[in-house]
Amino acid sequence: MKITSTSCICPVLVCLCFVQRCYGTTHHGSIRGTRNQTKHIEGETEVHHRPKRGWVWNQFFVLEEHMGPDPQYVGKLHSNSDKGDGSVKYILTGEGAGTIFIIDDTTGDIHSTKSLDREQKTHYVLHAQAIDRRTNKPLEPESEFIIKVQDINDNAPKFTDGPYIVTVPEMSDMGTSVLQVTATDADDPTYGNSARVVYSILQGQPYFSVDPKTGVIRTALHNMDREAREHYSVVIQAKDMAGQVGGLSGSTTVNITLTDVNDNPPRFPQKHYQLYVPESAQVGSAVGKIKANDADTGSNADMTYSIINGDGVGIFSISTDKETREGILSLKKPLNYEKKKSYTLNIEGANTHLDFRFSHLGPFKDATMLKIIVGDVDEPPLFSMPSYVMEVYENAKIGTVVGTVLAQDPDSANSLVRYFIDYNAEDDRFFNIDANTGTIKTTKVLDREETPWYNITVAASENDNPSLLSHVTVGIRVLDVNDNPPELAREYDIVVCENSKPGQVIHTISATDKDDFANGPRFNFFLDEHLSINPNFTLKDNEDNTASILTRRRRFSRTIQDVYYLPIMISDGGIPSLSSSSTLTIRVCACERDGRVRTCHAEAFLSSAGLSTGALIAILLCVVILLAIVVLFITLRRSKKEPLIISEEDVRENVVTYDDEGGGEEDTEAFDITALRNPSAAEELKYRRDIRPEVKLTPRHQTLSTLESIDVQEFIKQRLAEADLDPSVPPYDSLQTYAYEGQRSEAGSISSLDSATTQSDQDYQYLGDWGPEFKTLAELYGEIESERTT
């Protein structure tokens, strides 16, 4: 390939143009082009040319954490218009101007007055301005510049997530990754090695290692065994400056735990065990425990136990307790010391969760031998059967043998056994048992229809040790004998229609028997052979334990005979057979053409109305009694006597009620006007009933006449004289008692009649003493009194 001079010059020119552009933009040092200012003055154009000016400075840096006594020099601002005569004044504004950064307004030197921290603020943005000191006019436009804080290595690496807790399976391969740790450095990663971190392990060797660049922790050994050591503490260091001398460092702790794997088989502590079990141990109960040890933990130590061989395989069983990991030995069948005194079992314990990576460490199971010694125990008697069932016929005589139970002493001593029935307090004792032989007999006559089955409990004990008891249940079934005749299943209401035809079935009947099925059905129905043939009805046995009632003639009449009676016989199928007789009542009723009953005799009518004969009689009696009471009341009203005095000029009685402040007078019944009307009534009312009369009055015989022929005045005078002289008559004028309202008034009662005095005896002069209100009343009565006197 041929390269010409033209092709080489062009790239060089392009690079120079790029450098010049960057230099002028970055450092604000490019010479600004002159700007033409055009003025229009009276049609002429005047052009002014401005001289070229510009800022001159380098990029500013300030070192962080400067602790010197003098302010730290940052840099210098300079304008091309500054001739060094002090006419240019430099002004600094922006972040930290005047507080952190100060400027010499004459020279443009910038100093830092405080210690800065790059980790808090990496740079500051400020503005520079150059003005004429005399006119305060800007010589340069305001320009922005940046002061960067230069980093130093003042921050150590830090582990943000420590300390760490991590696990790794035991027996892991070398180089297995455990954990990656990361440390951070707050220094500037773009400047020097202040933030370049290198990892190393300070503690935990030779078991673990760490990658210096990534911080990944790995296992450094093969087959680390948890059973030998489970916990490890590893210290990791992170150092900046790429691990060089003088670099800052930080550390963290990583706690590593080896998790378990199934790498250990179970082991029995002993190869031979011996266990004592008494022969009285209950079937299903636990008789012993055995345990194999496993160095693993959790599910890796789970195991199951089994009986692999031995002469007690069918007698004992073993199960596993998952919580304690023990083998529980239980009894499957009862033990008998007299038959076998010891057993031998081979028991195996095997892990249930296997890890095939470690199968070469197996087998993961172990076996041991267990010898069981059976202990001799004095046992209660043993019945020959677990339960007994016996039978006896009902109505058997008292003392009938039902059956026999048998119990023996299972021990070698073979002592005698006694029997008794274990009754409850409320049981009715129908049986007893011979204490020596165990024979059960009846003590009462049994009835199968009342109780078909009995359950009793028989107990047996040894003579030498009565406290040892054994029990057995004896069920006694009562067998049936044919001792109950059949009877009708229910009461039948049989109806025959008046328009019935011969051979018509009017009803079907059935029977029941309290005896067992063998002595009950089949039932036979028939008419009594000793009676004459019934001309009206007959009976047909349906041979299915039912019978039909049939008519033997046409038409029945209620007016001639409304009820018929049909005697029948029923026999059962027992041996010997029993029979009974019953009488069927057949009513004659009027029916519709379709056979529906329309009406029967009076009893049927009452039944349809819902009333019985007794209820109807009671209703009729009540009606008769009510009618008799009404008639008697009317008769008494009509027979009442009229009063003797009947006149149009009869005395009128007016009762006037005033405001009475007392309890009423005692003489309210003293005067009765009927005495003037009926003299005989007056004779009854004039005597007092509260006292016995002192003088017996002679009866007065006088002929009564009509009211027109009697002198009323003489009659009244005569009665008044008799009343005044008779001490036994009621007092017509009596003292009235009222509520007490002060001293007794001098005025007397004016509401009663004085039968023994007259108005002339009254003295009304006292009215003048009552006051001026009663003066007129006193004068009025005084004049009347004076007129009477004259």
Swiss-Prot record:
Domain named Cadherin is located at 54-159, 160-268, 269-383, 384-486, 487-608
Pro-sequence residue ranges: 25-53
Q: What is known of its domains?
A: Three calcium ions are usually bound at the interface of each cadherin domain and rigidify the connections, imparting a strong curvature to the full-length ectodomain.
Hey, what's the signal peptide range on this chain?
Answer: 1-24
Q: What's the name of its gene?
A: CDH18
Membrane topology qualifier: Single-pass type I membrane protein
Any one GO molecular function term: calcium ion binding
Membrane-spanning segments = 609-636
InterPro entries referenced in this protein's UniProt entry, alphabetically: Cadherin, Cadherin-like_dom, Cadherin-like_sf, Cadherin_CS, Cadherin_Y-type_LIR, Catenin-bd_sf
Kindly state which keywords UniProt assigns to this record, in alphabetical order.
Answer: Calcium, Cell adhesion, Cell membrane, Cleavage on pair of basic residues, Glycoprotein, Membrane, Metal-binding, Phosphoprotein, Repeat, Signal, Transmembrane, Transmembrane helix
Function in brief: Cadherins are calcium-dependent cell adhesion proteins. They preferentially interact with themselves in a homophilic manner in connecting cells; cadherins may thus contribute to the sorting of heterogeneous cell types.
Residue intervals annotated with topology Cytoplasmic:
637-790
The record, for CDD domains, names: Cadherin_repeat (cd11304)
Q: What is the lineage of its organism?
A: Eukaryota, Metazoa, Chordata, Craniata, Vertebrata
Topological region Extracellular: 54-608
Q: Which organism is it from?
A: Bos taurus
| Biological process according to GO | adherens junction organization; calcium-dependent cell-cell adhesion via plasma membrane cell adhesion molecules; cell migration; cell morphogenesis; cell-cell adhesion mediated by cadherin; cell-cell junction assembly; homophilic cell adhesion via plasma membrane adhesion molecules
Question: What SMART domains does the annotation carry?
Answer: CA
Gene Ontology cellular component terms for the protein in this record: adherens junction; catenin complex
Please give the name of this protein.
Cadherin-18
Q: Which residues are glycosylated?
A: 36, 255, 455, 536
